[in-house]
């Protein structure tokens, strides 16, 4: 927790438009020199890491920034001096001694403000009481107050269970987040698990609709338009800064360019002279390249002009001359732009086809496939992209060199459009700035079993045919024009060590992988067919990943045995021969024979498991397939491997030893792939025909297993065999990949060969009689006599010469059948395509032409390039003219490509998610709509679905496994406002919608229990409905609690992610001291030990981040993060919840920050609230019964002392005293004389009364003081409940507000009259108690004893006189026994009973009868029939039966608390009843007058005339008697009231039955309510 202080620079109150300091700090508007003069208010709130740093960071006068604590040491225990950089560092917290540095030097005029030796500022030591420090946590840590409090704020905010959050915080569980790996950071897309936690989130039964988009089979990853070409003298050149890639549309419109390296036809083989002897430093280029003049720095000045030359060996010797002189010249060479110019010239796209003869040869200069050359000092890099787009039979090789002087910091940004990069979060530094720890590419490797069949790695399959079509390394491709196929662009990337210039420019291939050698490469994509086979045909290690494996489609007519043979009987033919005597004999020969004594051996390799390799740079079809098939587990494993691969940097050679076998999946992949890349990454693969492709497929995996075993040849000679070889045996030998042992390259000059091997990275395979492929020198060599498939492996003579056994013959026979069916063995097909290729080879022109030549067919080419078919549904708004791309002009096409470019190559995208139609924060106002959409989007993809093309290049999403507080911080960061509308408001709106739905459902179920439950007999249904109601109510309460937590974040600048700490503040040293004791010991504050624990464990996590265990889901990293979390928890609140407390050596729990703050001994209650201050006093409280509610009695002695300054000022003002001293003497000598002036001073000034402990707001209240005698404070008894005080010796403190603002605030906010209700519950807190309650009860109760006595003494309650045959029976003899009364009444009378009532009543005759129902409220009034004669209404004597009379008497005996004197009953005997003691009063003044005259008692029943409202205890009462006269006047008699009405039933008089005590009580209440002062307060 922190305080956000609001200041104002003036003495006036802050205006509304003044921004809060928190907002200013967030905007960076508050400077360090701002003087904040006055504190108006402060607010407790969350603090951001930036604000916590601002508390602690400060800049010394010498410009040094201090505040960070990284050392866990405190003081030197011998000298007790603070350690530098530790928890008591004088540089951070200030000097121990005033104006002395840690060196012991005192500040003088000559000394600067900061000691130059120790760096301590010369300031006062008081700064150690308020200067703070901070700890930068390596891993985020959750604040324990918001995690383990009740309720848990984070749990309510994220709508997750508290136990799950705790398990995630302490790294015992993982959280899977769907992320996007794109450019330089991970962007979170989906919080599906949060939505699933809501019971209304998912609804079943929703079907996914099929989507139709524009589908194109020729959709490539990169787009090229001629507008991106610039005209040059030598042709068209690509502008790298505008667009890094291009796409070739049709080979018919392509102009073939002359190659760079070519030798004249005469084939001179002389040894070329050395460049050093000539003394020339020139680059030699192809004849078709223009001269480029570049200048760079060197020892002797600038380099000379680059001249045009013909021979490439001269160019190489020039480079070798620079590199062989000295390392400094080598650095100058690469520091200059000469090599950059060389690359730029060769960055054009060369497509040449020429006839190769025996004298022509190619030099594979810079022969590594694709290299990334980077130097630490010069900041220059060369990057080569290898891109293939396969066409019919011959492929067009597209190369692009990306050259740019690069800063190391922008390295990832440069490569970000090409590859999906991964960089860590800011709080988890995985990599340094060095190149070896930067992930440039995304490596997709095979699964654990390295028996990986390159059949899937090197070829793809046709849509319907189902046969092997081509390898990515092959230039031979056979297909029919009607068939569609899938293609892709493989890319290779090899980063080298940054210090390569110190010894060698490019790393040479070695037998062992040195620690400094870091080589990676992107392997080609796997290409698939759209047709599947059954799952039982392919085995996989992971049974759950079968759906993501590609399947090879065979013809339906093939037998299962053929399929099995095809998968199992894969062969690799191993050539084994002796080394030749002279390497010159083997130099650049096209063909060579195998002598008869040559023996060829082969190895049988069984492969029954198929795996895939994946590259993120793929075309549309491949992305569509993989996005639908690849599951999250493989994606996650690939991402884990990628991070570990680049993090470790291949620094340990023994880790990748070839003999080591490890069960670890990641280590196994790294070791295998490293061996594969080191063995074959720079190889030049070539295939002349389909059979050679097959041999390469079979050879490649076995070569991986052999690793560094190399081929060797027996002795060969430059004989006529090379010129006149035409036999099939020679043709077979000419189609093999021959690998020279020890990876040697041979040149005409031995010296040049050695220099070349040291200068460049050597190529391992010399490709003879085939197509040549290098990184940027492209040669498509066509042999003189094309070979057919039948002349190779399917020829009987070939099989005989290869000495194939029965099994091998069967294999080739089975393989021959499907190939023959496809028509691939026809010589005519091969001859036709080769003839076309030869014709194109001679069509070389010097003048370059654009890629798209035909302007008329431009629109058609454009439509073919981007769109395959357009499906238009019925009712669609699309018009036919919009779908016809022939109507598009060039401007429209250019605009489309520009938009597409922006889509594919976004440099700085926002939050990316896979659900492109919803909001970025994945929050919907309506939960039901979101649930339906989520169910629709997360449904299993159908094979008829297609992806949106514009979003294909945005990267691949992964399910990343996270744990610890960092994952919680990522979830909380989703509530960070991203646009105009904050995410908190969206969530609050969603919760409000959920509450409306819950309220509606709860109301429906409650109505069910009110009305419908009576018609249902099934108890089980009722229980289910009841349980559903309970669940809905619990959900509603949870939603309300969550909404209550969300509301404080709305409209404020506080972010929920600040509940996770990344910066930890350190208290000033004075608050956690180290005190030396007498016995040569020291007492250390517990906080220092807790801070030390945090620092130690923070360093542990930092060490793991810098080491191999950089992934937060490794076991070691999890444990380290858990320890750090527990250490911070113990520092904030030790032992909270179920966490184990950190104890001292004596098992005593250490005191944490919370222990120092809370409790009676805490900082607030002990040091602040209990501190003695001026203008305060303390005394015992006693009751003041005559005080008003807002008054308190203040002793005179205390009042004179408290108000003395105001009293002295008033005495001087009234000239009673002349000065301050005389006034004090007057007060001391004659205090009674100044009491009147003191009352004037106290008249409008309140005092604050406080009783400890102050547990809530009402613990301090304001009162009007009243001078009293004595030494105790008088307090109104009703306010004791707010203070929790009683009058048994409690003490209260008195405080005097000084300013007028304080007095006004005391009256308005703290006055006792304004605090009648409890702020916690809203219930009244000032209630009558003790003697007040007793007095009110005595006034309003009935005296049961006196009433009982009157029953025996008078006829007050039963005032009737009974006469029976001259005998009078007194009621007192039977009043105590109900049975006696019953028996007495039920006696049969011998004569009529005479009834006498009040004088205003009439006699009742038997002549007229009336019916009366006493049990209902409806009274039947009998009208008088005889109006002439005044008659009374009589009741029939035998009206009630004996049973009814008995019931009435039983009610009479039960209701003893009611007045019984008016209960009507019918007596069977003739008797007269009269009463003279009932008292009637017209107002309560008469009642009080009779009470004072003692005419009536306090509890005597009386009848009071009343014309206002009144209340009864009973809700319904029946009339006891109704009396009517002949004029229609009526009297309604009730036990509690009497109503007199006229003939029109208008109420004339109304009497209520009460007592004088109740009259007195009500009179006091009415007078109090009608006071003017009380009316004003209301």
Curated annotation (Swiss-Prot):
Binds 1 Mg(2+) ion per subunit. Binds 1 Zn(2+) ion per subunit. Signal peptide: none annotated. Its main location: plastid. The keyword Transcription applies. This is DNA-directed RNA polymerase subunit beta'. Zn(2+) binds at residues 101, 103, 115, 118. In plastids the minimal PEP RNA polymerase catalytic core is composed of four subunits: alpha, beta, beta', and beta''. When a (nuclear-encoded) sigma factor is associated with the core the holoenzyme is formed, which can initiate transcription. It comes from Tupiella akineta (Green alga). Its cofactor is Mg(2+); Zn(2+).
